[in-house]
Amino acid sequence: MTVSASKTAQQLKYIKDSIKTIPDYPKAGILFRDVTSLLENPKAYSASIELLSEHYSESGVTKVVGTEARGFLFGAPVALALGVGFVPVRKPGKLPRETISESYELEYGTDTLEIHTDSIQPGDKVLVVDDLLATGGTIEATVKLIRRLGGEVVHAAFIINLPELGGEARLTQQGIHCYSLVSFDGH
């Protein structure tokens, strides 16, 4: 293992160890992976931004899109590091300019996301960033918004992946390359 690979492995372990697991939250049987504990640790937070930025440094991405709300915390610094614009995708009524919206299914009901109509240009190569990949529903809705504006979603990046919930497989089937810093078993 090279020094660089060894450093990366150490950083990934440090990041994973900084994420607290809360049992039975928000309901019994769920193991909640709390990324806010990573944010409280500047060394782990910095390492996560560094690793994501390095991973996409040669990707040709022209925009980074972050989903509300924790996607902003990782997407905006990655966009700065890559020297590209950051675009927020938000809940309805939170963006001041003209928007388009996309509804998507939740376990119990539906939710909606919005994006400014002038934030993505036709041909933009987009990296979508969020804190956690579970079923992929939120990211799928985000991808639909970007594609409706003419953007090409080439990558999706996450701090945490919960592979058992199928989100990565769902997005991969749509031609989206997924990258996660760490994975956890269970829900």
UniProtKB/Swiss-Prot annotation:
Pfam family, one: Pribosyltran
EC number in record: 2.4.2.7
Keywords: Cytoplasm, Glycosyltransferase, Purine salvage, Transferase
Gene3D superfamilies hit by this protein: 3.40.50.2020
UniProt xrefs under NCBIfam families: apt, PRK02304.1-1, PRK02304.1-2, PRK02304.1-3, PRK02304.1-5
Family classification: Belongs to the purine/pyrimidine phosphoribosyltransferase family.
Quaternary structure (record): Homodimer.
Annotated InterPro entries: Ade_phspho_trans, Adenine_PRTase, PRibTrfase_dom, PRTase-like
Any Gene Ontology biological process: purine ribonucleoside salvage
Function description: Catalyzes a salvage reaction resulting in the formation of AMP, that is energically less costly than de novo synthesis.
Protein name: Adenine phosphoribosyltransferase
Reaction(s) this enzyme catalyzes, per UniProt: AMP + diphosphate = 5-phospho-alpha-D-ribose 1-diphosphate + adenine
GO cellular component: cytosol
GO molecular function: adenine phosphoribosyltransferase activity
Record pathway: Purine metabolism; AMP biosynthesis via salvage pathway; AMP from adenine: step 1/1
Top-level division of the source organism's lineage: Bacteria
PROSITE patterns hit by this protein: PUR_PYR_PR_TRANSFER
HAMAP family linked to this entry: Aden_phosphoribosyltr (MF_00004)
Localization per Swiss-Prot or TrEMBL: Cytoplasm
Group of enzyme by EC: transferase
